[in-house]
């Protein structure tokens, strides 16, 4: 018992100090022991995520969720598994996991809401995309600029041109990403031309 507790203590210190390979070895030794299985699996899943080993994230995460369906750590497991699925190109499972994550916390991370919104958009679920992306744009940064561009596209798909115009305008007036800015400006200009709504000056100047 003392040896197991000592191994867990050393593994936790290694994890906290960024010695992830050492921590992984130590937690792997402990993960088949009932007293340490849940905590060890959780740390192992986190380490694989930090190391971008997404297939292993999913494998360990599945075992953790199956063994401990009511764990208080499951919200974070949903989050990192959702990200792993997204990076592997499985947007259906990314939506499945990230939507569980968002439902399980009062303060979902903006980056995860953005990924969820993009996945919804790519799957043609534009109303859900608007909901997720709309919760992303709380700060003046590159993430919000990208989210506004996707919001504009989502509103266009929903035939809500007024909200689309405002979203494109928000992305176009931000300068964090030049390509996003130009794409937003182009879409904003098209909408102004189409709806004869004047902002930013006359529509003819927008196209210049």
Question: What does each of the following model-derived ranges do?
Answer:
Residues 1-208:
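Acidic, polar-rich low-complexity tracts and alpha-helical solenoid repeat scaffolds
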């Amino acid at each position: 018992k003392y040896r197991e507790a000592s191994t867990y203590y050393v593994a936790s210190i290694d994890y906290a100090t960024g010695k992830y390979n050492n921590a992984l070895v130590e937690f792997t030794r402990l993960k088949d022991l009932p007293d340490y299985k849940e905590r060890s699996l959780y740390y192992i899943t986190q380490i694989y995520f930090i190391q971008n080993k997404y297939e292993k994230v999913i494998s360990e995460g599945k075992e953790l969720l199956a063994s401990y369906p009511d764990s208080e750590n499951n919200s974070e497991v949903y989050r990192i598994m959702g990200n792993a699925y997204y990076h592997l190109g499985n947007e259906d499972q990314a939506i499945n996991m990230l939507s569980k994550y968002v439902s399980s916390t009062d303060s979902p991370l903006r980056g995860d809401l953005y990924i969820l919104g993009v996945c919804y958009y790519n799957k043609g679920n534009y109303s859900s995309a608007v909901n997720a992306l709309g919760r992303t744009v709380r700060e003046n940064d590159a993430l919000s600029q990208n989210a506004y561009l996707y919001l504009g596209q989502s509103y266009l798909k929903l035939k809500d041109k007024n909200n689309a115009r405002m979203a494109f305008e928000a992305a176009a007036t931000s300068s964090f990403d030049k390509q996003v800015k130009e794409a937003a400006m182009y879409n904003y200009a098209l909408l102004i031309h189409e709806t004869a709504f004047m902002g930013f000056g006359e529509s003819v100047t927008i196209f210049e």
